[in-house]
From Swiss-Prot:
Localization per Swiss-Prot or TrEMBL: Cytoplasm
One GO molecular-function entry: DNA binding
Family annotation (PANTHER family): TRANSCRIPTIONAL REGULATOR LSRR, TRANSCRIPTIONAL REGULATOR-RELATED
Entry GO CC: cytoplasm
UniProt entry tagged with the keyword Cytoplasm: yes
Protein name: Transcriptional regulator LsrR
Keywords: Cytoplasm, DNA-binding, Repressor, Transcription, Transcription regulation
InterPro entries: NagB/RpiA_transferase-like, SorC_transcr_regulators, Sugar-bd_dom_put, WH-like_DNA-bd_sf
Protein's job: Transcriptional regulator that represses the expression of the lsr operon in the absence of the quorum-sensing signaling molecule autoinducer 2 (AI-2). It also represses the expression of the lsrRK operon. Acts by binding directly to the lsrA and lsrR promoter regions. In the presence of phosphorylated autoinducer-2 (phospho-AI-2), LsrR is inactivated, leading to the transcription of the genes.
A Pfam family matched in the record: Sugar-bind
Activity regulation, per record: Inactivated by phosphorylated autoinducer-2 (phospho-AI-2). Phospho-AI-2 acts by binding to LsrR, which is then unable to bind to the promoter regions, allowing the transcription of the target genes.
Residues of the DNA-binding region: 33-56
Assigned protein family: Belongs to the SorC transcriptional regulatory family.
């Protein structure tokens, strides 16, 4: 019996990856077939058949003989080391569009997490917009409500613009960064802004990107014009390694104090983000490893979608 590696399932996995994951959960983690079917969104009969197919094809022997084994090992280590609820590590492929593949992986994770009519809070950035573009049909069919976590309407349009016009989207009607702390306070006190921020904090699931100070000019927050290169240099000198929603934190995951932009941001602060039950971080690139690790240490995310090389770098850091 041969494995069909060309067909991609509704869960975004080829058959070999499904077999590898089922085998790992069954033999390594000790899950029952019923528990595995719930986790992967498959019928119990499908799980049983794929286990048998794994044995007959040679994937399942004394060890899991699959190119996905490394990803599964990284997922287990990340889950244990950082107390994560959910992890998806995608295998590395030469010359592949990592951002697009992360978006696919994050989209399938969200499809397994969100129930009909629940609310999804979204942060700005390429990773989250890549995810949103691949969720449009699911969002429409399941009547998922969307709410933005920060101001800056333009930053969200590449994702929101792909959605059905009937989709419920609550956007903060303000810039991401005001020109002064006083103006930011005034805007956040406006009911139209305050109501969206309250809705965002009440979301069932959140998805955010993670920026790294080490990215320098490649960082979304710089390319979008929200901070200057000089500001980024100053922020780095204060010990910051990464940011979520424009809020910078150090290697321990603590928000760095005395940073001007923090008082000028219009969005959900990280302390409020942590009250959302499931917080998915989607980010890749070895230069982001320290920032991703810090975000997990700070508890800003409790679920992660990343690539194999980045996962290895995180575990080495």
């Amino acid at each position: 019996m041969t494995i069909n590696d060309s067909v991609i399932s509704e869960q975004g996995m080829c058959e070999e990856e499904q077999v590898a994951r089922i085998a790992w959960f069954y033999y390594h983690d000790g899950l029952t077939q019923s528990e595995i079917s719930d986790r992967l969104g498959l019928t119990r009969l499908k799980v049983s058949r794929l286990l048998e197919k794994g044995h007959q094809s040679g994937i399942i022997r004394v060890q899991i003989n699959s190119r996905f084994e490394g990803c599964l090992e990284y997922e287990t280590q990340l889950r244990r080391q950082f107390s994560l609820q959910h992890v998806r590590v995608i295998p590395g492929l030469a010359d592949a569009d990592v951002g697009g593949r992360l978006g696919i992986g994050a989209a399938h994770m969200l499809m397994s997490l969100l129930q009909p009519q629940q609310m999804l809070a979204i942060g700005f950035g390429e990773a989250t917009m890549n995810t949103l573009q691949r969720l449009s049909g699911f969002i429409s069919s399941q009547q998922i409500r969307l709410v933005t976590l920060s101001g800056g309407v333009g930053s969200y349009m590449t994702g929101i613009g792909q959605l059905n016009a009937a989709c419920s989207v609550n956007i903060i009607p303000a810039p991401l960064r005001a020109s002064s702390a006083d103006i930011a306070r005034t805007l956040k006190n406006e009911n139209c802004v305050k109501d969206v921020l309250l809705a965002a904090q009440a979301a069932d699931v959140a998805i955010v990107g993670i920026g790294a100070v080490s990215q320098q000019d490649d960082a979304t927050i710089i390319r979008s014009g929200y901070i200057s290169q000089g500001e980024q240099l100053m922020i780095g000198r204060k010990g910051a390694v990464g940011d979520i929603l424009g809020y910078f934190f150090d290697a321990k995951g603590d928000v760095v104090t005395d940073i001007k932009i923090h008082n000028e941001l219009i969005g959900l602060p990280l302390s409020a983000l942590k009250t959302i039950p499931v917080r998915v971080g989607v980010a890749g690139g070895e230069n982001k490893a320290e920032a991703i690790a810090a975000a997990m240490k700070g508890g800003y995310i409790n679920a992660l979608v990343t690539d194999q090389d980045t996962a290895a770098a995180i575990l080495r850091s």
